[in-house]
Amino acid sequence: MKLTDHGVFLCGGVPKQTAPLTPDEGRRRTMAYRILQAHNQSGDERQLRIRFDAMLSHDITYVGIIQQARASGMKEFPLPYALTNCHNSLCAVGGTINEDDHVFGLSAAKKYGGIYVPANQSVIHSYAREQMAACGAMILGSDSHTRYGALGTMAVGEGGPELAKQLLRHTWDAPLPEVVLVYVTGTPRRGVGPHDAAIALVKATFASSFVKNRVLEFAGPGIAKLPIDFRNGIDVMTTETTCLSSIWETDEETKRFFEVHGRPEAYKKLSPEDGAYYDRMIELDLSQLEPMIALPFHPSNAYTIRDFLANAQELLAGVEAEAKKRWPKANVHLLDKIHDGGVWADQGIIAGCAGGMFDNIDEAAQILRGGSVGSGYFSMSVYPTSVPVSLALTRLGVTESLLETGAIIKPSFCGPCFGAGDVPSNNGLSLRHTTRNFPNREGSKPGEGQFAGVCLMDARSIAATARNGGRITPADELDYTPERHPYQFDKTVYARRVYNGFGHPQPETKLIMGPNITDWPRMYELGEHLLLELAAVIHDPVTTTDELIPSGETSSYRSNPLRLAEFTLSRRVPDYVPRAKEIAAKEAERREGSNPSDILAALSRVGDAEALLNTTQFGSCVFANKPGDGSAREQAASCQKVLGGLANICYEFATKRYRSNCINWGMLPFTLDAGTPFDYAPGDLVFVPDVRKRLEKGCEDFPAEVLRQTGEKAELLLHVKGLTPDERDILLDGCLMNYYAKRG
């Protein structure tokens, strides 16, 4: 894979350094530009204000989104909005609370005119592909893996407040992104699947932020040779590159997809116009790809399986060392997986929006046919991505074949991807064709001494491994001839079970709210000055949203902001919640007119404490080098806010969506200049004078003072760059809900 970090033109279907066009003229010839401008309401091509064609949320986000929109005056859903139930669908934690969310979702779909997909019918992104994607369309989802570029749809994953804005008939605002050409050539060899291509792409781009907040535009002769499931499998993983969105050329294969799904009108031919200009380029030669493995704790920590097996001792020792550093309570050992001439896994999982597609499961079954998973410690589970896919596999005999080998077929459920299904054993090594292998995302609890490792692999190599009883094996080492079967979609599945009320709201319908569904607590506007106490200081290279607010069983409480907030940073900084609560209690005392001695003492170090007390807002703050990689979950920010969080300080944000979440929840997204030392500790204070006035004026620099617990003081220059006028007002008002409430 070759990366080019300067502009290129696509002329006659071939990348070139020059063309008889200016770059600005060429930019207007990309697919991405044309789709974005078709949805842009601003009148300014460089400052987008996008209205989407449709939206989707699953059952750990839609309750909070609807609650935000209700509180801001929403009366009906103004665009198709699908509510899927693919995360807390086991209903195994918290008594009735998970099914209570589902009942709320159906009542909301009826009241406001939405689409309700019952539990286990489909994972969110499969339903979007099957029923909502269309060439030239744009879809917004409250899940980071909202990616339907291979179907000609530009899709964006964002936190819940951005969806609430659309429900209130407002726009998604962003500067015009740069576009990166992914020029695809070659044909994958036997045994190489979409996850191999995707993992290789993430490895090549993530660490350098090569495509961060940019759009990936896939073109080139190699696309025509890829089945649509293969394309979708690469596309959904582009999220892990930190790109903003994606779009692919469409062709006869795309057309067949829409015809099979009974939506031929959704197809149209998309391709870059001759002379299209791209800010960067990635050359992806499919013929050079090998079966890949991504080791803990990130999809970019990737190697060819062959290289991994040749260097397993060294590589697993490195994973062990990192795990022991992160979780000293856990008795981590992975090196014992190396024995009997191989590396042995304990579990194989094919699941979710990346793994559970028809072609992946079909070819995995072909590899396993006539073999056995065995009767040892290794187990294998397969989760088809939707009931229509499961039904097609059953009718073809694939389900029967897999069951005969000892694999288990499970429902359409996202659990293995976020820690709510098939949690491995302590010190277990799980191979997964899912999207992520972040720390603890598989469900282990390091605070209780638990550890498990997840490696990402393609379904084909997982099947090859299963055939060998758990000995990690690349699929291209097996002698088999894959046979591609046509997919038959049965539209009656959704016709019988999915409630589609778009355009037909029933305002008289009463929302059904279980006891766990609560309103958001009161949030206050920004003070004249800020006094921030560091409640967590994290120096890891990247901090994921899974660390900021764990998934798995904690997701069951996402309809209850205060209850969920109890889990904030619980697996990374266990002291954060009690520390943040203590800070919030002091701020509550200040608001009630008391004079907390700690706050007075701190303010006396920067000025007249009595004069500053009534105008200085006191709250907690998290420092992390690069926070927000991973999920779109707004709760990574809202839980900090609920606990009294007022800011994040970092060198850069890992993703736009996490920064947007911070802004929408009224937390100042402060950044530091690269190289600025930050050797402060929890309990140290940061005083930001005149923060409100400077924000109102549009200032981007915020001089601050750090008050160490040792009595020392230090100057610190903070930045808040690139805010839109609306974002400034949201921060001033304290959060998005306050912003809308203030404006009626």
Where are each of the predicted segments found?
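Fe-S-dependent hydro-lyases/dehydratases of central metabolism
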Residues: 1-744
